[in-house]
Amino acid sequence: MFENVIGDWPKHERFIITSCDDRYFNQYFPRFYKTFNEHWQLPIHVHVIDPKNESLKKLQYLKLSHTFCYTDSNILKWPYSFETYCQAQRFIVLGHHMLEGQSVIVADVDCYALRKPTKQQQDILESD
């Protein structure tokens, strides 16, 4: 499964990761990307499940890192839904690829940043 993840893992010490299928990428990721870039100013990594060619082209123009994969039908034979599979991907990919010393914020793709992090949040972001 993990050998089929295409793309480069980010080398940043701190970044935000999210994952989604192609539908959620087009529906929610533009707002996610815009607001987190504007308010949090941390690198963003997105993992896209079953992306269409149009989505892959969009990714090339954005200032971020990305990986993607295509669903192996054998995985969906487990007693899990496709939605569960999609929801778990960011944690699975992160657990498999995270480098020593990386500090990663895991976020839902349908969330967005309303404002800059508070001082307390910023201190947490900068601590290690």
Q: Which residues make up each language-model segment?
A:
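GT-A fold catalytic core of metal-dependent nucleotide-sugar glycosyltransferases
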Residues: 86-128
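A short, glycine-/small-residue-rich helix N-cap motif at loop->alpha-helix starts
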Residues: 25, 78-89
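Short secondary-structure transition/capping segments
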Residues: 57-58, 79-81, 117-120
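N-terminal anchoring/stem segment of glycosyltransferases
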Residues: 1-78, 99-100
